[in-house]
């Protein structure tokens, strides 16, 4: 199978905008060479939009304390990436979270007056006290973001701008408590998003935003707010109610004027994982693309994130990227190692890629060996990083025979990787996959030692995790990423 087959066999009912969003704020900021390779990969796979998720990893003037340890992108670099994307017919859409997920700003004393809860808040989902992470919903913070927009947006030729706006966890717990009690949290949220929208439109751009708050309450979606915006309906688990949410958004857009745009955003399921949640990813992608075509979405934005240390290798995105491209275009979706190998060879990832493709497919299904699931993350990854009572909680209810089955799976993957030609073993994707397999294997050996109450074996594997695996992780990181964020990622080991 070749990539050309996607467009050649594409359905006329395919999705017009085929986008990919890469998180560059949770640790990993790729080198410019790695960005260039990504853009080339996306172009070859028929993607036509790229977004880089940014919270603090842009070198804003006068805000050096926020990004000084992050190896941030510069204006010159963003302009170079914009040019590179235009040359490959890819729209480079600016993405800067502007309401929630701003912990890396608000942890500094200088910015705490902008916070909804300057001293932190109680997170109902994580059931713990968290540091401030959401701007207050007021003119002051909208003006602050406007000044950042003035500096950030001239680097992009796109007429769209994704301001994020997802998960403002503590909204209504601090400065806006009385207003939310009086007017309702969603109304306070929409009022502030309208403030930001005015600042976006000043730059001649259309505001994109995550739709979770909009869809979080039942009832009719305020149609007027959606005018000249692009809501993005995101959901990363198979079985996400895309149909119901698309129906609500489509109805609101028709009420607002009929020709409104909206996107759907599935995920690669690579985050909080070593690459072992592929089964969930492919179902999620298929369901999102199906709903996008059914309800006339203008785009699908495949996302990948780096929550809690960004330990997921980029190679874990390869199969989801290929499958999503085919699904978006309504083309035949590759399924076998041989089919993926043909595509990987064409993309220049490997010359002889069948063994690599087989190993990547098998590794992606590793978590299927264990019946216990943890929402939005890999249980194998949790077996590696969880400590103390958290590790005991992860292991609760996990039977020894399932750990053994997963270890058998790892052993088979290791045998397959031995078939990868020697000339291909210097490829970054091979090194990433080898490391991911080693880390998953260590996690399973740690789990086995716990179940056997073998303190000596557990101590040995934990020493390996904190020693050779940590060292190898840093070495592989540096092959394609900047130094910023690495120390934070290593602190999890």
Task: Outline where the language-model segments fall.
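Feature activates predominantly on carbohydrate-active enzymes
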Residues: 1-183, 188-191, 195-203, 208, ...
């Amino acid at each position: 199978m070749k990539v050309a087959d996607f467009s050649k066999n594409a359905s006329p009912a395919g999705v017009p905008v085929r986008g990919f969003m890469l998180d560059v704020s949770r640790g990993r900021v790729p080198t410019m060479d790695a960005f260039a390779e990504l853009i080339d990969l996306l172009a070859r796979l028929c993607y036509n939009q790229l977004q880089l998720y940014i919270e603090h990893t842009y070198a804003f003037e006068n805000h050096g304390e926020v990004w000084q340890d992050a190896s941030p992108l510069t204006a010159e670099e963003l302009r170079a990436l914009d040019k590179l994307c235009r040359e490959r017919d890819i729209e480079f859409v600016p993405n800067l979270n502007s309401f929630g997920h701003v912990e890396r700003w608000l942890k500094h004393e200088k910015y705490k007056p902008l916070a909804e809860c300057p001293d932190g808040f109680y997170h109902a989902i994580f059931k713990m006290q968290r540091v401030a992470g959401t701007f207050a919903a007021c003119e002051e913070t909208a003006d602050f973001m406007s000044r950042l927009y003035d500096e950030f947006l001239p680097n992009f030729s796109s007429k769209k701008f994704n301001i994020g706006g997802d998960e403002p966890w503590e909204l209504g717990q601090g400065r806006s408590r009385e207003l939310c009690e009086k007017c309702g949290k969603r109304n306070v949220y929409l009022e502030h998003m309208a403030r930001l929208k005015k600042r976006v439109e000043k730059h001649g751009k259309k505001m994109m935003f995550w739709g979770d708050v909009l869809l979080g309450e039942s009832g009719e979606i305020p149609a007027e707010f959606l005018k000249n915006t692009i809501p993005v309906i995101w959901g990363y688990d198979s079985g996400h109610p895309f149909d119901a949410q698309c129906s609500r958004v489509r109805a609101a857009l028709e009420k607002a004027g009929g020709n409104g745009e909206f996107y759907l955003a599935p995920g690669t399921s690579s985050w909080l994982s070593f690459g072992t949640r592929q089964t969930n990813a492919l179902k999620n992608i298929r369901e999102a693309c199906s709903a996008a075509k059914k309800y006339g979405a203008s785009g699908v934005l495949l996302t990948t994130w780096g929550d809690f240390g960004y330990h997921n290798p980029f190679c874990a995105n390869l199969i989801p990227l290929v499958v999503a491209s085919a699904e978006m275009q309504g083309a035949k979706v590759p399924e076998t190692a041989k089919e993926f190998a043909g595509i990987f060879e064409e993309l220049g990832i490997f010359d002889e890629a069948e063994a690599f493709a087989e190993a990547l497919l098998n590794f992606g299904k590793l978590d299927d060996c264990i019946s216990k699931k943890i929402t939005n993350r890999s249980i194998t990854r949790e077996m590696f990083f969880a400590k103390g009572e958290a590790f005991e909680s992860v292991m609760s209810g996990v039977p020894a025979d399932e750990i053994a089955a997963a270890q058998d799976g790892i052993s088979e993957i290791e045998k397959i990787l031995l078939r990868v030609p020697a000339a291909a073993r210097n490829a970054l994707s091979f090194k990433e996959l080898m490391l991911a397999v080693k880390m998953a294997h260590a996690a399973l050996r740690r789990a086995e030692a716990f179940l056997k109450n073998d303190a000596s074996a557990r101590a040995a594997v934990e020493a390996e995790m904190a020693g050779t695996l940590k060292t190898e992780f840093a070495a592989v990181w540096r092959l394609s990423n900047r130094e910023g964020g690495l120390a934070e990622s290593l602190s999890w080991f």
